[in-house]
């Protein structure tokens, strides 16, 4: 069972007529995603990959039931697009935009919490359940990376996602649902908020998190395990072990500040909670074996 999106999820694409939107809409459909409509202001009546385009989400809802929406819009337009979707009652939103203004991302997260909705991103590749559906920009056709299986994956990094997931597959496992929470300082939703969904999913035997220095998301995962609300095996790989304090490393969120966010502190907390931490991607599969997770 996919935890965020599956073949039954009715998906809208906001920004569908742009080059990124149209390109990835085709790949989303190719994988099996049920994309039913698109939204681009001023483009109502057009068709993209056989999908009708509407001026607004409100107009689209007059003709379609929408479960989730995928945003391919510029950073400075993201807040308005997310709020439009939330006001329409859509509870699952993915935005890949990199560089959403920090204060606007804070507003987005607060509004999503108030609406009991999930906003995945920004600065993410999105969400994918291999062989089922995706919302985002994953190279899903690479079988050695995106093979269906029983390992849930959450990640803050795009490039590390491909590397670690490839190692999971090489070790004899596959992926149930992969969620890229994004690499910005304020994501729409955090690792720990998705753990209850993986806990309830009978097809997910274990979870792998791909984290990095900065922020406190990995520490929140450790706290969730210690509280006993997540009980499945968990393995982590954390990038940035040798990064100097105060130096941003690739992502805006990958920075150690105020004595918090160091990889060493994250490792200590995760291991104290009973999770395993791999010191390199290739060891993730071995640690899953050590935790008794059966192969797919």
From Swiss-Prot:
Keywords, alphabetical: Carbohydrate metabolism, Ligase, Nucleotide-binding
pH dependence: Optimum pH is 7.5.
InterPro entries: CoA-bd, CoA_lig_alpha, NAD(P)-bd_dom_sf, SUCC_ACL_C, Succinyl-CoA_synth-like
Active-site residues, record numbering mapped to chain: 251 (tele-phosphohistidine intermediate)
Subunit structure: Forms a complex with SqwK.
PANTHER family xrefs: SUCCINATE--COA LIGASE [ADP_GDP-FORMING] SUBUNIT ALPHA, MITOCHONDRIAL (PTHR11117:SF2), SUCCINYL-COA LIGASE SUBUNIT ALPHA (PTHR11117)
Classification via NCBIfam families: PRK05678.1
Name this protein carries in UniProt: ADP-forming sulfoacetate-CoA ligase subunit SqwL
Source organism (scientific name): Acholeplasma sp
Biological classification of the source: Bacteria, Bacillati, Mycoplasmatota, Mollicutes, Acholeplasmatales
Encoding gene, per UniProt annotation: sqwL
């Amino acid at each position: 069972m996919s935890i965020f999106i599956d073949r039954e999820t009715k998906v809208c694409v906001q920004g569908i007529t742009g080059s990124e939107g149209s390109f990835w809409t085709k790949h989303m459909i190719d994988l099996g995603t049920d994309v039913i409509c698109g939204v681009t202001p001023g483009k109502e009546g057009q068709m993209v990959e056989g999908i009708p385009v509407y001026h607004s989400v409100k107009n689209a809802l007059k003709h379609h039931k929408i479960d989730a929406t995928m945003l391919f819009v510029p950073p400075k337009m993201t807040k308005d697009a997310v709020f439009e979707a939330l006001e329409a009652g859509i509870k699952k939103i993915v935005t890949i935009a990199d560089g959403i203004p920090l204060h606007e991302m804070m507003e987005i997260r607060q509004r999503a919490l108030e609406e009991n909705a999930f906003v995945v991103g920004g600065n993410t590749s999105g969400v994918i359940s291999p062989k089922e559906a995706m919302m985002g920009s994953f190279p899903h056709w690479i079988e050695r990376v995106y093979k269906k299986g029983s390992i849930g994956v959450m990640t803050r990094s795009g490039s590390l996602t491909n590397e670690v997931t490839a190692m999971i597959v090489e070790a004899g496992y596959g992926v149930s649902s992969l969620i890229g929470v994004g690499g910005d300082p304020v994501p729409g939703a955090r690792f720990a908020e998705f753990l209850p969904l993986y806990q309830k999913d009978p097809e997910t035997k274990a979870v792998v998190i791909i984290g990095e220095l900065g922020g406190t998301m990995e520490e929140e995962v450790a706290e969730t395990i210690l509280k006993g609300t997540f009980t499945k095996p968990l393995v982590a790989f954390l990038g940035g072990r040798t990064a100097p304090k105060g130096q941003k490393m690739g992502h805006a969120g990958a920075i150690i500040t105020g004595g918090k966010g160091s990889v060493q502190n994250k490792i200590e907390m995760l291991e104290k909670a009973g999770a395993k931490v791999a010191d390199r991607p290739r060891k993730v599969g071995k640690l899953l074996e050590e935790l008794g997770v059966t192969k797919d």
